C-alpha cells in the first residue's frame, strides 16, 4: 500500500532511488533529499495532522507537501542531516540544543489542565497490568498519594514521544540545527515535566543513569521550579508506563524491561520524594 501511494506521487526515476527508513505508524522512505512518510488509508488524516503540529513547533519550513488520497496519506519533508540519538554522538552542544528546543515547545500554551482523574486512571491501568509485581504495585500506590503534585497543571505543547529513534542528532560537518524531533503525530497538550521524563527514559538513559540524570537536571535548570519538582512524579510514572507497554504489547520483552526499568523507577522516587533536593 505504501508503494502504491508513492507510485501515484513520484516519477519512476525518483521511485527507484527510495530507501526505507522504517517507522511504526507509517512507512518512511527517503530519496536522499526528501523524506516520504506514508500512512495507511485509515490513518491518512495523520499526514495533515503531523504537518500542522510540525508547524506549531516551528518546523513548518521543513514540510514540502501533504497528500491524501485513496491509497493513504503522504507527508513529504526535507531530510534532516542526522542519525538517531546515540551516546557517542552526545555532546554539550547537543544538550544545549535540546534545552532550547524543549523550552521553546513548552512556552506554547495548549487548552485545559492535567486532571487528577486522568492521572489516577493511568495509574489504575498500570496496577492492573503489573498486578503480580509487588514492588511496582507499591510504587503505583506511592504515586497515587502524590498525584496532587501533578494535577491541575496548565497544559503546554509537548512532543510526547522523544525516544531515541525519534530524536535525531546532526551529522558532523552538516549544516542546520544540532537536534531534530520526528514523529509529531502524538504531540499536543501535556505537562512539560512529563515531556522531559519521556526524554530521559527514552533517550538520555542510553548515556547511563548517572549521566542521564545529570543531563536531565541540567536541562531542567531553565524550567520553573514547579516543573523540576514534578519530575519526581513523572519519571517513575513513565517507567511504569514502559513496563505496562511491554506487558500488554510486547510480553516477550517484559522480563528484561522489568529488570532494567523498575530499579530506576524506584531509585528516582526514593531519591526525590520527599522533595529534599535543592533544585
Show where each model-derived region lies:
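ATP-binding glycine-rich phosphate-binding loop
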Residues: 10-30
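A glycine-centered beta->alpha junction motif in the catalytic cores
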Residues: 69, 74-88, 125-126, 240-255
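A conserved alpha-helical element in kinase catalytic cores
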Residues: 34-76, 85-105
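An alpha-helical support segment within catalytic cores of ATP-dependent transferases
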Residues: 2-9, 110-160, 164, 169-173, ...
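Pre-DFG segment of protein kinase catalytic domains
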Residues: 157, 180-183
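A cross-family kinase active-site recognition segment
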Residues: 66, 81-137, 153-155, 186-190
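Activation segment
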Residues: 41, 179, 186-189
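Active-site activation/catalytic loop segments of kinase-like enzymes and analogous catalytic loops
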Residues: 193-223, 236-253, 263-264
Amino acid at each position: 500500500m505504501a508503494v502504491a501511494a508513492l507510485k501515484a506521487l513520484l516519477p519512476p526515476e525518483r521511485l527507484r532511488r527510495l530507501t526505507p527508513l522504517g517507522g511504526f505508524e507509517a512507512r518512511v522512505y527517503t530519496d536522499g533529499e526528501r523524506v516520504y512518510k506514508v500512512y495507511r488509508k485509515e490513518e491518512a488524516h495523520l499526514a495533515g495532522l503531523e504537518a500542522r503540529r510540525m508547524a506549531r513547533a516551528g518546523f513548518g519550513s521543513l514540510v514540502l507537501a501533504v497528500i491524501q488520497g485513496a491509497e493513504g496519506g503522504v507527508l513529504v519533508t526535507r531530510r534532516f542531516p542526522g542519525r538517531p540519538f546515540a551516546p557517542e554522538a552526545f555532546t554539550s552542544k547537543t544538550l544545549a540544543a535540546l534545552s532550547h528546543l524543549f523550552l521553546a515547545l513548552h512556552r506554547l500554551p495548549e487548552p485545559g489542565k492535567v486532571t487528577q482523574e486522568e492521572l489516577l486512571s493511568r495509574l489504575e491501568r498500570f496496577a492492573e497490568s503489573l498486578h503480580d509485581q509487588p514492588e511496582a504495585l507499591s510504587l503505583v500506590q506511592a504515586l497515587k498519594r502524590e498525584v496532587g503534585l501533578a494535577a491541575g497543571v496548565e497544559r503546554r505543547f509537548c512532543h510526547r514521544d522523544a525516544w531515541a529513534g525519534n530524536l535525531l542528532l546532526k551529522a558532523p560537518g552538516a549544516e542546520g540545527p544540532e537536534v531534530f524531533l520526528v514523529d509529531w503525530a502524538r504531540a499536543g497538550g501535556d505537562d512539560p515535566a512529563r515531556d522531559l521524563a519521556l526524554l530521559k527514559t527514552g533517550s538520555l538513559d542510553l548515556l547511563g543513569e548517572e549521566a542521564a540524570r545529570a543531563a536531565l537536571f541540567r536541562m531542567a535548570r531553565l524550567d520553573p521550579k514547579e516543573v523540576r519538582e514534578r519530575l519526581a512524579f513523572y519519571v517513575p510514572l513513565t517507567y511504569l508506563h514502559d513496563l505496562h507497554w511491554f506487558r500488554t504489547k510486547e510480553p516477550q520483552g517484559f522480563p528484561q524491561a522489568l529488570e532494567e526499568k523498575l530499579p530506576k523507577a524506584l531509585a528516582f522516587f526514593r531519591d526525590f520524594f520527599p522533595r529534599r533536593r535543592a533544585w
